[in-house]
Amino acid sequence: MVFLKVNGLSSRYSSSKGPVYAVDDVDFTLEDGESIGIAGESACGKSTLGLSIIRMLSGGKTQGDISFEGESILDISESDFDNKYRWKKISMIFQGAMNSLDPVFTIKEQFVEILKQHHFDGDFDKVILDAITSVSLNEPVLKKYPHELSGGMKQRV
């Protein structure tokens, strides 16, 4: 099953010399269970691509088509996208993600806070443990504070 399909995606910014295309006519398809890594030189459009997909491109314009689980997500309202997709089904790990952890809360407390903000009503302990183990971390990590983790561990959290 096609999970994410990006077709003809272009993202541009305006400049005094005209439009600057940070992403130009990108196509890719991800099947359910697949993942993708985006690599490239500084300022080549990696972050712009991600921001375009999650509809958070500030000061730019995006065209093309992005379908998630068969639904075109560029054409739906901002509130529908927020309620149904952004941070629920589609997320982005930003550069410097390690800096987003709150130093005064344990890793588990931070997971709990996120689940509460998203009105999760299931088994907190189970979903948190499943998330941690899915990135090859173990349960004792949940009792630690961010400064007690290595850089790689923070990035996986």
Language-model features, listed with the residues they occupy:
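A short, flexible loop at the N-terminus of ABC-type nucleotide-binding domains that lies
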Residues: 1-3, 12-25, 56-61, 77-81, ...
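Conserved hydrophobic segment flanking the Walker A/P-loop of ABC-type ATPase nucleotide-binding domains
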Residues: 30-32, 85
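The feature captures the beta-strand-to-loop junction immediately N-terminal to the Walker
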Residues: 39-41
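Conserved ABC transporter NBD signature motif
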Residues: 62-74
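ABC ATPase NBD coupling module
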Residues: 73-91, 117
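Q-loop/switch helix immediately C-terminal to the Walker
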Residues: 96, 103-117
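Conserved ABC ATPase signature
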Residues: 109, 145-149, 153
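Conserved ABC ATPase "signature" region
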Residues: 123-140
